[in-house]
Design a protein with these regions (language model features):
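Core of folded catalytic or high-affinity ligand/protein-binding domains
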Residues: 477-478, 485, 489, 495-496, ...
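Metallocofactor- and cofactor-centric catalytic cores in central/energy metabolism, strongly enriched
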Residues: 267-271, 275, 505-506, 697-703
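Long insertion/accessory domains within large nucleic-acid-processing enzymes
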Residues: 671-708
Length: 708
């Protein structure tokens, strides 16, 4: 049996601890009120006789109290209760010592593998984790209702980002970068005016990204099309300066060539600034900013030609990669690139197909960019095309006072995720029981999400001036409440879910790709979506359905359920649950069928979704990859390619670092297994990860089959 401690950690059951606690109470009462060792053993035997695989400490103590009362040892029972209360006071005084000290000793494996883009060996990252442990502790003991904390500990739900809940900050956003560049902003009390050149605009953009990232805990996105006007400003400035310097001594063609050369130099330098700054900056969160660059060539854009040059340069530099410490070009994890397919660049003879061809080459080698189909997205979002907030979180359409759609300058309040497989396990194949329990768990999620929402209601704009006062989200006066931005759908708040495949297998005995399973899975998704829609109507808060990325959660839920319910074939035995609505990573299905199947769930999960296919090395078969990109444009809103992009620093091997039978990363050429001497980049959950993963996610990565 396993015991869940109050801090959420899980330890082996030890009956001697129960006996010792009763004996301590025994020593405090007169002889006639004491309990013999035989009767103490009998109480413990009754607890063990329940044969539960997993119990909370509180539940064990409740059973001890009941046992003492049943023995008519009321004085002893009272003394035990007082002892229990005093122990609780000690725990409330400090419950984080061991987790923090184990982190500093580099012995906290769970924390070290929680986020594949955080290196817990680095002092700045450790500081963030130490603060996070304190926040988790305060959240569990004080800030959340006890029943919410208990549901989280039992794996019924996951209250995301408890390590930041103690602070009045939110999840992710679409930075209103156009407004900040055009109208200026303020950082660290210093006025930043509108840039006069592309290079300066790129520098300011990276400064904004860093400042924003340090004041929220989730991802952010920047629409690169706002930089087009600054490239034109640079062109005009160069033309003016060169014309003056040459004093009419060059013809028009030569002047154009000289200007083009200067523009291309600045273009390359500016984009390089963004790429290197993002990959070398470390925010107060102890990591590089989780940022997405949105690459969308809009036909009605007055700076379309400039933006085409910018997008092309971003892709060229990503294709080249960034040098590691050994001087070898590798795949960087950030920034994430999202490239929009539209009629003029969907590989059907459009004007900008050449940029899409470059994007395909880049995806084949560096995994990014991911692809959004403007055609399909317009069908789901009232004719609009806009960036996800970070990885996959999408806003709902919202109109300002003038009736114009607005997406930039909006944000997500937070996420709570539902463990679908656990509901299936508890229902034991009984659909009536399943739907009843699902409704109960949804109510639990709603109440947990309202904790998220209520925590932000008292926030004033002074808490993060870059967000609330200087344009990233709004331009509120100092001291103004942000509460109005929490209502009316301006911001979203997300119900996440994980394990649609597993819950379908539990309830129907088949994958959700099977027709019978698909019908059930769609009904589950519709029920989740209806809950969000109903809550939105009842509260005027922007509830949205979100396919949880589950980088570490895929393992946490599966681990808890295995400990509680034992090994269940094809469910808890794998060591992980499947992300959101995705097809089981082990299931053999081709890329076209996978995208077609998953596209129907994207229409329901509009608060957050992304689909992927695993591909082999396609660098010498780009035509096949182009066919998939054409298919994406016509069939699915948001899609990505997973390939392998690794490097062994010991022998110079450039290919796939494998996961061996011991679940360890190993170079197939020289058998190097030292993770500090290899660069491994994998798709973790929409983002790329490069600092390795927990045991569950590693098993999931190892199990992935090719779809092309």
């Amino acid at each position: 049996m396993k015991v869940i401690k109050r801090d959420g950690s899980i330890v082996d059951y030890d009956r001697s601890k129960i006996s010792a606690a009763i004996q301590k109470a025994n020593a405090e009462v007169p002889e006639e009120d004491r309990l013999s060792q035989d009767r103490i053993d009998a109480i413990i035997d009754r607890i063990e006789g329940l044969k539960r695989p997993r119990m909370l400490v509180e539940d064990i103590q409740d059973l001890v109290e009941q046992g003492l009362v049943a023995e008519n040892k009321f004085h002893l029972a009272k003394t035990y209760i007082i002892y229990r209360y005093n122990r609780a006071l000690v725990r409330k005084a400090n419950t984080t010592d061991e987790s923090i000290l184990s982190l500093l000793r580099n012995e906290n494996k769970e924390l070290a593998e929680e986020n594949s883009n955080k290196n817990t060996m680095i002092a700045a990252t450790q500081r963030d984790y130490i603060a996070g442990e304190v926040s988790r502790d305060l959240t569990r003991r004080i800030l959340l209702p006890e029943y919410i904390s208990k549901a989280h500990d039992e794996g019924a739900i996951h209250f995301h980002d408890a390590d930041y809940f103690v602070q009045p900050i939110f999840n992710c956003c679409l930075i209103n970068i156009g407004d900040m560049l055009d109208n200026g902003t303020v950082m660290n009390g210093k006025l930043i005016e509108s840039p006069k050149s592309f290079q300066v605009a790129c520098t300011v953009t990276t400064q904004i990204i860093a400042c924003v990232a340090s004041n929220q805990y989730g991802g952010q996105s920047v629409d690169m099309s706002h930089l087009g006007k600054y490239l034109r400003r640079s062109r005009e400035k160069f033309r003016k300066h060169i014309s003056y310097e040459c004093a009419g001594q060059v013809d028009g063609a030569t002047l154009d060539r000289l200007v083009d050369d200067r523009v291309r130099d600045e273009l390359k330098s500016g984009v390089q600034t963004i790429q290197y700054q993002i990959n070398t900056l470390m925010t107060t969160n102890g990591q590089s900013p989780f940022v997405t660059l949105f690459l969308n060539l809009r036909e009605d854009d007055p700076y379309l030609e400039e933006n085409a040059l910018i997008v092309e340069e971003v892709l060229r530099q990503r294709l080249e990669g960034i040098k590691n410490e050994a001087g070898v070009y590798i795949t960087p994890a950030f920034p994430k690139l999202v490239y929009v397919l539209d009629e003029h660049n969907c590989l059907k003879g459009g004007k900008y197909d050449y940029i899409t061809e470059l994007a395909v080459r880049c995806s084949a080698k560096r995994m990014y960019p991911d692809y959004i189909s403007a055609k399909k997205m317009k069908e789901n979002y009232e004719g609009n095309v806009f960036s996800p907030m970070g990885c996959r979180s999408f806003l709902s359409p919202w109109k300002d006072a003038n009736g114009n759609y607005q997406f930039e300058g909006r944000f997500n309040q937070g996420v709570v995720s539902l463990n679908l497989p656990q509901i299936g396990i508890l229902s034991r194949g009984d659909e009536d029981a399943f739907w009843k329990l699902l409704d109960q768990r949804l109510q639990l999620c709603f109440e947990a999400l309202m904790c998220r929402h209520n925590a932000l209601k008292s926030v004033r704009s002074d808490s993060s001036p870059i967000h609330w006062q200087y344009g990233a989200i709004a331009r509120l006066p100092k001291g103004a409440p942000i509460e109005p931005l929490l209502y009316g759908g301006y911001s979203s708040i997300s119900l996440g879910y994980i394990g649609l495949y597993e819950v379908t297998k539990l309830m129907k005995g088949v994958s959700h790709t099977d027709p019978q399973g698909q019908d059930f899975a769609l009904r589950v998704m519709d029920r989740l979506r209806k809950a969000c829609d109903d809550w939105k109507k009842e509260t005027n808060i922007g509830f949205a359905l979100y396919g949880t990325p589950a980088e570490s959660l895929c393992y946490r839920f599966a681990r808890i359920d295995k400990e509680r319910f034992g090994t269940i074939p094809d469910i808890t035995d794998k060591g992980y649950y499947t992300n959101s609505y995705h097809v089981d990573v082990r299931e053999h299905i081709d890329a076209f069928d996978k995208f077609t199947f998953e596209s129907q769930f994207q229409k329901i999960s509009t608060g957050g979704c992304i689909s992927y296919v695993e591909i082999p090395n396609m660098r010498h078969n780009l035509e096949a990859l182009k066919e998939v990109v054409r298919f994406i444009y016509n069939n699915i809103q948001y899609a990505e390619f997973n390939t392998k992009s690794d490097y062994c620093q010991v022998c110079g091997y450039d290919g796939e670092i494998i996961i061996n039978d011991d679940n360890q990363w190993e170079c197939p050429a020289c058998h190097n297994m030292d993770q500090t001497k290899m660069n491994v980049t994998r798709r973790t959950c929409g983002y790329l990860g490069e600092n390795y993963w927990n045991v569950g996610k590693t098993k999931e990565i190892k199990s992935r089959v090719l779809h092309l």
